[in-house]
Regions:
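Short amphipathic alpha-helical segments
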Residues: 14-38, 72-76
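Absolute protein N-terminus
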Residues: 1-2, 96
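Residue-level signal for well-ordered alpha-helical positions
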Residues: 21, 43, 67-70, 79
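Glycine-rich beta-strand-turn "strand-cap" elements at beta-sheet edges
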Residues: 39-50, 75-96
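Acidic-residue sensor for enzyme active/binding pockets
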Residues: 34, 56, 90
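A beta-strand edge to alpha-helix "cap/lid" segment located at domain peripheries
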Residues: 23, 31, 66, 88-96
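Short, well-ordered beta-strand segments in beta-rich or mixed alpha/beta enzyme
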Residues: 2-9, 39-68
Length: 96
């Protein structure tokens, strides 16, 4: 299993708009519906007002690679350009 902790550092005051657009366009739901997806959830950190945390779990590397080719993933990259200044990705692999 592959786990990604993705921290989006948003432009000041833009985090809520970023998350609203993701959900309005169904990007989160589409990702959850992909083959091999186990978890795809957004969290709002209490301390960092402009950060948005995404926790993803994928069955294997093939599922994660396929995710990167989906139209909703491409759309997320376009949305990020408007709202996000930096993306930090932590990747973990487990034997599960």
């Amino acid at each position: 299993m592959i786990v990604l902790n993705v921290t989006y550092q948003c432009r000041p005051g833009m985090r809520d708009r970023f998350l609203e657009q993701i959900t309005a366009e169904g990007i989160d739901a589409a990702s959850r519906g992909e083959k091999g997806n186990i978890r795809y959830d957004y969290y709002l950190p209490i301390v960092e007002n402009d950060d948005l945390l995404l926790v993803e779990k994928w069955q294997d590397a093939d599922a994660l690679t396929e995710h990167g080719h989906q139209p909703h993933y491409v759309r997320l990259k376009e949305i990020k350009a408007e709202y996000v200044t930096e993306t930090i990705i932590e990747r973990f692999e487990t034997g599960e």
